[in-house]
Amino acid sequence: MAEQTLSFVDCLMSRFPTVRVSVAQPRGEISLDVPVVEWCAVCKALRDEFDFEQLSDLCGVDYLGYGNAEWDTTDVSAQGFSRGVAGKAVGRFAWGEFPSAGSNDGTQPWDVPQERFAVLAHLISYRHNRRLRVRCFASNDALPIVASLTDVWPGVNWFEREAFDLFGIVFEGHPDLRRILTDYGFIGHPFRKDFPLTGNVEVRYDEEKKRVVYVPVTSVEPRVSVPRVIRDDPRFGAAAGESTHSETVK
């Protein structure tokens, strides 16, 4: 780990004792996992004390099914992927159904989050030429609520609206939290892993009503043509210089 990166990590650990700091090697990419109750306070301190004056991006993440594989590619590849499906995983169910395919058996080399929804922000300090990734998890999967950062970085307004629209994450204190991408009256949040790929409704023109109407999906059958797998394949190995592992400092 570069001396400059190590020094910065030490400063973060000293300033935020309840925050988990991790560094992805060999590039030294620093990430913070912040308790949701401290989300605003930590971000404000990063802006004021560490000169992270710009939030370049904020997004939501749905960890439902994270670390789970749907397909048995070892024994049935020659016979077709559809013969190896075990249960209905993400994308293979209709509206109102729920994924039933396997789970992480604890042998995976990564940590599977206990909470489902996370908010991820990328910060930039131009003064110190640094980038930082900050993440927090909503404590309630049924109604994920995270404090809004609009008072810290006003430009985050539309980013939070997008995360609300696509993931259903409620940003408490946001001045205008409404959908920004989907249509009026849209049902559900399309980037959630339990949102069917077929959607909930389809659009057609009604001759009697002389207008476009929304009706339940009946003409599309849920199917996945690309396998959802987790495997060690050299073709997908990290390029030289890319991050290959993450080291939790604290």
Swiss-Prot record:
Catalytic activity field: a quinone + NADH + 5 H(+)(in) = a quinol + NAD(+) + 4 H(+)(out)
InterPro entries: NADH_DH_suC, NADH_quin_OxRdtase_su_C/D-like, NADH_UbQ_OxRdtase_30kDa_su, NADH_UbQ_OxRdtase_CS
GO CC annotation: plasma membrane
PROSITE patterns attached to this UniProt entry: COMPLEX1_30K (PS00542)
Pfam families registered for this protein in UniProt: Complex1_30kDa (PF00329)
Keywords (A to Z) from UniProt: Cell inner membrane, Cell membrane, Membrane, NAD, Quinone, Translocase, Transport, Ubiquinone
Keyword Zinc (UniProt): no
Transmembrane stretches, start-end: none
Membrane topology qualifier: Peripheral membrane protein
One MF term in the entry's GO annotations: NADH dehydrogenase (ubiquinone) activity
EC numbers for this chain: 7.1.1.-
Location(s), subcellular: Cell inner membrane
Family (UniProt): Belongs to the complex I 30 kDa subunit family.
Subunit note: NDH-1 is composed of 14 different subunits. Subunits NuoB, C, D, E, F, and G constitute the peripheral sector of the complex.
NCBIfam families (UniProt xref): PRK06074.1-1 (NF004730), PRK06074.1-4 (NF004732)
Protein task: NDH-1 shuttles electrons from NADH, via FMN and iron-sulfur (Fe-S) centers, to quinones in the respiratory chain. The immediate electron acceptor for the enzyme in this species is believed to be ubiquinone. Couples the redox reaction to proton translocation (for every two electrons transferred, four hydrogen ions are translocated across the cytoplasmic membrane), and thus conserves the redox energy in a proton gradient.
Protein name in the entry: NADH-quinone oxidoreductase subunit C
Lineage: Bacteria, Pseudomonadati, Pseudomonadota, Gammaproteobacteria, Lysobacterales
